[in-house]
Amino acid sequence: MTKAWEKNIRKVVPYVPGEQPNKERMIKLNTNENPYPPAPGVAEALKNLDPDRLRLYPDPACIRLVNAIAKQKGLKSEQVFVGVGSDDVLAMCFMTFFNSDKPVLFPDISYSFYSVWADLYRIPYETPALNDKFEIVPEDYFKENGGVIFPNPNAPTALHMDLEKVEEIIRHNQDVVVIVDEAYIDFDGRSARELVHKYDNLLVVQTFSKSRSMAGMRIGYAFGNKDLIKALNDVKFSFNSYTMNAPTLAYGVAAVEDDAYFKECVEKIKNKIGRASCRERV
């Protein structure tokens, strides 16, 4: 058999997911999972799920979950897109928005999946270096490019960029899409959510995996200008209409609706992080 297909993937170095050891009584830190269980409403939704519903295809538009997220974020439903974890959403973003001959810009020390997607989709990219304090330098993103993406807070440095600096990057790149990856925003920093009404080129991506304790459910979402969301849906419906299964959609709605529990768990984690930081300094 000829292997003509190899030329499409032979240069790709795949992302290495975190190990999931099958051992009891282990403190697992390698993939930053939440130590607290999901909201009680999620367990209730699991208990009340009608098995007969599983014979039907799930809602391809994920309307109930989209509406719940939009309401919680103070947005319109047409401004929200959901996917199978933020990795799925981000991969679709690379496919949808980063298709010019100009390089996409993202930090040299950052989420390692960015370069994997760029290589897989043959997207040129450049990786501006962090400064000597491991901070993103906004001015490095003012040059001509085919799009910008960065995490805030950054991973793995855990440093967040002030919203004013985030806006500087967006303001200097209004001809391309700027994606702010906010997987950890609930633990530190200000979300760029308040800027989506001001800039139609801004897309913010978040996840249920960290602050909402649902890494096993795989729910991620993006919000921004309705035209960006429509473009993402056009790509999604071009290859897989049913990306999210019915149980996951139900659990996601239950998680969003229990905002008090979510905030309580986030505060507990932030307090523990603060105590750990104090011990390090001592």
Predicted regions and their residues:
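N-terminal "arm"/small-domain region of PLP-dependent enzymes with the aminotransferase-like
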Residues: 1-56, 144
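Short glycine-rich anion-binding loops that position phosphate/pyrophosphate groups of nucleotides
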Residues: 32-35, 86-87, 111, 152-156, ...
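Phosphate-binding glycine-rich loop
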Residues: 63-103
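PLP-dependent aminotransferase-like
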Residues: 96-151
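Active-site pre-lysine segment of PLP-dependent enzymes
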Residues: 133-144, 156-178, 182-214
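PLP-dependent aminotransferase class I/II
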Residues: 201-277
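Positively charged, low-complexity/disordered segments
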Residues: 280-282
